[in-house]
Amino acid sequence: MRHRKSGRHLSRTSAHRKAMFQNMAVSLFEHELIKTTLPKAKELRRVAEPLITLAKEDSVANRRLAFDRTRSKAAVGKLFNDLGKRYATRQGGYLRILKCGFRAGDNAPMAYVELVDRPVAGEVEAAAE
């Protein structure tokens, strides 16, 4: 029986799952918008949102924890220098999952995962001027 077991297996070993979500989180922090399958998107929330919450308080210990979970210096830098400050007043819900149809090959439900309050291309150009 699988009573009170949380999380999705996604037909992968635990090491593969850990590496996959680590890579997806780094990609999300770098690009602020990624496209993936709906179950992966829902599970990515459980990995990425605690990292953003951790980044709201900048300390050496928190940076080391974030690096341990992402293994990417660039992602940790962006988390603490940009995203932590951006979401300092937000209590949670840093990600938005938007359904975007089905994949052509296997009809898998697809979704966009994006950071809430991310700057849109038009706003970035206007702010630069």
Curated annotation (Swiss-Prot):
Transmembrane segment boundaries: none
GO molecular function: structural constituent of ribosome
Alphabetized Pfam families for the sequence: Ribosomal_L17 (PF01196)
GO biological process: translation
Gene3D superfamilies tied to this protein: Ribosomal protein L17
Database matches in InterPro entries: Ribosomal_bL17, Ribosomal_bL17_CS, Ribosomal_bL17_sf
Cellular compartments per GO CC: cytosolic large ribosomal subunit
Entry similarity comment: Belongs to the bacterial ribosomal protein bL17 family.
Protein name: Large ribosomal subunit protein bL17
Lineage of the species this protein comes from: Bacteria, Pseudomonadati, Pseudomonadota, Gammaproteobacteria, Pseudomonadales
Gene: rplQ
Organism for this UniProt entry: Stutzerimonas stutzeri (strain A1501)
Subunit structure: Part of the 50S ribosomal subunit. Contacts protein L32.
PANTHER family tied to this protein: LARGE RIBOSOMAL SUBUNIT PROTEIN BL17M, RIBOSOMAL PROTEIN L17
Record key words, sorted: Ribonucleoprotein, Ribosomal protein
